Amino acid sequence: MNFADEDYELKEVQRLEGHTDRVWGLAWKPAAGVDGVPSVLASCSGDKTVRIWEQSASTGSFQCKAVLEDTHNRTVRSCAWSPSGKLLATASFDATTAIWENVGGDFDCVSTLEGHENEVKSVSWNASGSLLATCGRDKSVWIWEVLPHNEFECVSVLQGHTQDVKMVQWHPSMDILFSCSYDNTIKVWSEDGDNDDWHCVQTLGESNSGHTSTVWALSFNASGDKMVSCSDDLTIKVWGTDIKRMQSGDGNVTWTHLSTLSGYHDRTIFSVHWSRDGIISSGAADDAIRLFVENEDGSVDQPSYKLLLKKEKAHDMDINSVQWSSMENRRLASASDDGTVKIWELGSSLGQKKQSM
């Protein structure tokens, strides 16, 4: 995607209010927003609830359609839709992960996954919806197999991190799992084809140009050959791999550091997300959102990235999550300690400039 040297602006189109505590996580429902299906966003909060927001076809504004409550008794830290959009997984500080089934707009808790010793921090579905991963403060990563009738079986408990695991994320097209932690590392997990055992195949840490403090989040580009991560060390790092070799089943393919973006946030960067058309968004404890794109004149092997836009005071407090819409390329949602969710649209500010001249 070519981003010419013109001015862009991130316009706030709606502020979603209703949560009574900080909002931790966001998840856009897949396959919504096309063929007349409305865009749907889930948000989860320290108020122990999940809210489902749906865009009105007539007004274009988002309205709260459901509040998922009375299941978790502590903070809901993370939420994720299954690829089909039929199930929503929610991870909570109460040490459980709940599975909600969406039937005609109504949500029923159909399964509760137990096993973590304490707070569950993150939940992620693989591309086919056959596996679910969770992680927590107990330093472990759990992989669950999705069985018929909304049953879930733990197939592996991965004990590689030495501290709290902040996030798990499946690769967008392959059954390879990534986790990031308070131990300053990202770990890559893969299944051994011979004996079905999951094991760590690579650790990205300080020794291979990785982060020097807590890694809070990571995200993949659309083709799955690059990954972006963010950290308490105030940097954003881009990693790359040989995706064709990986897809061919070569188990020796590794991820390498490509670029470090620093000096753009002055407090902890809590969230990064890569849009389908190549824009990296970041949200941080400095209440700001930043957008980055790849430099057109960078080399294939050593790409560099430039700041596309900065939005100061995007929220009144820390920004915990930024998520691009899966269907609307230029729509971004953000969640904050200020208890709100905001919907943003990215556009050129050229039109506004001409009108004001």
Describe every region a protein language model picked out:
Residues 50-54, 97-102, 123, 141-145, ...:
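WD40-repeat beta-propellers
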Residues 2-3, 54-60, 101-105, 145-150, ...:
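Short loop/turn segments immediately following beta-strands, especially the blade-tip
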Residues 27-38, 79-85, 124-129, 169-175, ...:
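Loop/turn segments within WD40 beta-propeller blades
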Residues 16-23, 68-76, 113-120, 158-165, ...:
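WD40/WD-repeat beta-propeller blade N-cap
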Residues 11-13, 61-66, 108-111, 152-156, ...:
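A structural motif specific to WD40 beta-propellers
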Residues 323-355:
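Blade-level signature of beta-propeller repeat domains, shared across WD40, Kelch, NHL, RCC1
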Residues 1-40, 46-51, 56-58, 297, ...:
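Intrinsically disordered, low-complexity acidic/Ser/Thr/Pro-rich linker and tail segments
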Residues 44-48, 90-94, 128, 134-138, ...:
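Conserved strand-to-loop turn within each blade of WD40 beta-propeller repeats
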